[in-house]
Design a protein with these regions (language model features):
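A short beta-loop-alpha structural element at the N-terminal edge
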Residues: 55-68
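Conserved GNAT-fold acetyl-CoA-binding loop/helix
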Residues: 65, 69-95
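Acetyl-CoA-dependent GNAT
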Residues: 85-139, 150-151, 211
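Glycine-rich acetyl-CoA-binding "A-motif" of GNAT/NAT acetyltransferases
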Residues: 110-113, 175, 202
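Conserved catalytic-core motifs of GNAT/GCN5-like acyltransferases
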Residues: 116-119, 166-169, 181, 186-203
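Conserved beta-strand-loop-alpha-helix junction that forms the acyl-donor binding cleft
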Residues: 141, 167-177
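Conserved acetyl-CoA-binding loop-helix of GNAT-fold acetyltransferases
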Residues: 142-155, 178-182
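Conserved GNAT acetyl-CoA-binding A-motif
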Residues: 157-169
Length: 211
C-alpha cells in the first residue's frame, strides 16, 4: 500500500500548482489592465465632463438676447460676416426678423450660436422667401456647430412653409460659403462692388439659395 504521507504530499503539490496558476493568471490580468490604462489614460474623463459636450438646439427666447447680441458683436468685429457696424437693440432686431425659425445652439450649457430669418419682400407672392442670419461665437467656431444650426434652421423653415432660403455672403467669408454649400445652398449670383464697408472699400457679395 502507498504510504498516507505520500498522498498528503501529492495533494499539497496539486494545491500549490493550482494556487500558483491562479496567481499567475490574476497577476497577468492586473498587469494587462495597468498597461492598457496607461496607454489610454488620455481618453478617460470624469463622468461629469460628458455634459460639457452636449449639444442642444432650441427656439430662441427674449432672455437669450444678452448672449445673442454678444455673439452678434463678435461677428461684426470680423468685418466679413456682415455690413452691420453695430448691434441693434432687441426691439429693432425683433421687428426685423420673423417670429418663427429663431434658433440657438448650446454647447455644454453655453449659448454658442444663433440663427434667424427675415423676409426679403413684404409682398404676398414672396411670403415663402427669407434671408438667413447665422452666427457662431468666436470660441465655438470650427467645431461643426454652424452646420448643425443651419441644418436645423433649414428643417424648421421648410416645416414653417418657406420654399426658398437665401443668404448674402461677403466676398472674404469663404467659410460661410462652404457652410451654406454643405447645407444644400447653391451659388446663384455674384454682385461686384455692390457695397462699401466701414473703411470705404468696395466689396462683392455672393447670393446663395436653397430651394
Amino acid at each position: 500500500p502507498v504510504p498516507l504521507l505520500y498522498h498528503k504530499q501529492v495533494r499539497c503539490q496539486n494545491n500549490f500548482c493550482a494556487v500558483r496558476f491562479l496567481y499567475r493568471a490574476a497577476n497577468s490580468a492586473i498587469l494587462k489592465f495597468i498597461r492598457e490604462w496607461k496607454e489610454n489614460a488620455g481618453n478617460f474623463r470624469p463622468a461629469e465632463d460628458e455634459s460639457m459636450d452636449k449639444i442642444i438646439i432650441r427656439p430662441m427666447t427674449p432672455e437669450d438676447w444678452g448672449a445673442v447680441s454678444r455673439i452678434y458683436v463678435e461677428g461684426i468685429a470680423t468685418e466679413y460676416a456682415t455690413f452691420q457696424t453695430e448691434c441693434p437693440p432687441y426691439t429693432a432686431w425683433d421687428a426685423s426678423h420673423t417670429k418663427e425659425c429663431r434658433l440657438v445652439i448650446l454647447s455644454g450649457g453655453v449659448l454658442a450660436g444663433w440663427c434667424a430669418l427675415h423676409r426679403v419682400d413684404p409682398r404676398w407672392c414672396y411670403r415663402g422667401v427669407a434671408e438667413v442670419s447665422i452666427y457662431v461665437g468666436e470660441q465655438f467656431r470650427g467645431h461643426g456647430l454652424g452646420f448643425q444650426l443651419l441644418s436645423a434652421l433649414c428643417a424648421a423653415a421648410e416645416k414653417a412653409g418657406y420654399w426658398t432660403l437665401q443668404s448674402t455672403v461677403l466676398q472674404d467669408n469663404a467659410a460661410s460659403r462652404a457652410l451654406h454649400a454643405k447645407c444644400g445652398f447653391r451659388l446663384v449670383g455674384h454682385r461686384e462692388r455692390i457695397a462699401r464697408d466701414c473703411h470705404g472699400h468696395w466689396l462683392d457679395t455672393y447670393l446663395m439659395e436653397r430651394r
